[in-house]
Amino acid sequence: MSDKKEFKAESKRLLDLMINSIYTHKEIFLRELISNASDASDKLYYKALQENISGFSREDMAINLIVDKENRTLTIADEGIGMNKEELEEHLGTIANSGSFEFKNALEKGVSDVDIIGQFGVGFYSAFMVADEVDVYSKKYGEDKGYLWKSDTSDGYTIEEAEKATHGTTIVLHLKKDTEEEDYSKYLDQYEIERLVKKYSDYVHYPIKMDVTTSRKKEDSDEYEDVVENKTLNSQVPLWKRQKKDITKEEYDEFYKAKFNDFEAPQRVMHNTVEGAVSYTSLLFIPSKTPMNYYSQDYKKGLQLYSRGVFIMDHAEDLVPEHFRFVKGLVDSQDLNLNISREMLQHDRKMKVMANKIEKRIQTELENMLKDDRDEYVTFFKNFGMQLKFGIYNSYGMLKDKLQDLLMFYSSDKKELITLKEYVEAMPEGQKEIYFASGETIEKCDLLPQVESVKSKGYDVLYMTDNVDEFCLQMMRDYDSKTFKNVTQGDLDLETEDEKKELEQKTEDNKTLLEIVKKALGDKVQDVKLSHRLKSHPVCLASGDGVSFEMEKVLNQMPDAQGVKAGRILEINPDHDLFKSLQSVYEKEPVKIDEYASILFDQALLIAGFSIDDPVEFSNKITKLMIEASK
């Protein structure tokens, strides 16, 4: 007897997408099921090596495809490690834990069904794109009982004991009926199956076998007869072991999509064979888009690790540095012990040698991309540039020399992303610092009053729009001996000597007024002063030399926020008509100074991107002033 169990919510949603899919690449189901069969075979082979199981040969293992046109079934059978009842429920009843978080996020963000299938419609569930019923017979290696997992809808599934002679997993797909839009019968055609295996799974290092009917002449006769032979459909040569010159872009793309569960072709491929004290082959990919889960805890960095073509582990983290964690791929070395553990890898000298060379290879690839294909590098940087910045920040600046020339920031002058080297080379004579402004968007940076002032001097301003930007620059300290200067922080020292003297005189003349405004604002500000930093704007906020305004915002968004607050200095434009109005109020109606001071401070807060304490009160004060002005 078997009890029907319901799929978990995320699994049901994904199954609904599969069952009702308009996805045009339904044929990938075979790629995914063969890939699973290969993984199961790898696991058993690895177990046999670790436990010295006698009488076990990898050459005896195969993946078998069985076509039954009469019953409209396609079967994929392996002789791998198999699953017991608990594992069937864990692996087939729910989305793998590593995928559930980002799947939920994708649904919440309203990502299209097609894109969701492209991201998550991989592995076993893809079978439901072509089948309306799926039977999975499995028996785990070393155990006596076999089980049947069965589902014909997205509502649920059953698991019951079943006879199975050998270990491994057999998946029987009951294909959907043909429709006007879809021809499911083609997956019962031997030539179509051969084509799909050749296209997607040729590199699988277990023979993929199928009974194939061919026609040949009878002996001593002109008549033909049909002959059935069990044919191996794949070459079994791993892609990375072939010569680069013999591999097409399409082959690299299809391998990447199949191996690393990506819907898109990679942006860049790095295929290298290294001979020396440690010999290895690496096949590395830079994805063309940022994975949905890239900035979540679910994302796992690292490369697949092989030894002499035998799979060892999925995420060898030590092979790729944190600042290049976006790189996917694999490494195959004949110099590694097959029984090496994850703990031993951390201290293995050969692993460290490979890791250093792989890091240099990625670094060189990015440098060449920036030099030879600017547009492609800009695309890459928009996807993964933040990771390079985090690399400098997380290393406390230790990686500055390696990564600084790969960074790009938006230029107020060029209206595009530029490198720090390009900024410095374009600096006019007399400019001593690299000016930058921080904000949520380029548009908000562009509107800052302080930016206007710096641009009026003919200086370019770099816009920092990522949360990590200022923290990264803080760790770098300088570039090419030029220090970084936040235009909203401290004294910019852009005035001529005459302008400085003029400002000193105006400050002295209005000393009492400024003191009254400061007193009115109390502990909201550190200081109130006149400034030549402003051109067309009446007021702005500047921060002291400690935490900047954007750093304050970022730090206060963190879970353990301590209420960090940057020092606020209210700067007033002495040449603006509003200041003249303030002077007039001070002379004629000094009791109103407190109200004017409050309005000016709230204005400055809004310009700097902060919220104000009481928007209603601010609105009422503005309304009152407008009414008084009309009288």
Positions of PLM-derived features:
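GHKL (Bergerat-fold) ATPase N-terminal catalytic module, capturing the glycine-rich phosphate-binding loop
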Residues: 1-190, 195
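GHKL/Bergerat-fold ATPase module in large chromosome/replication-associated machines
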Residues: 116, 134-156, 176-186, 191-631
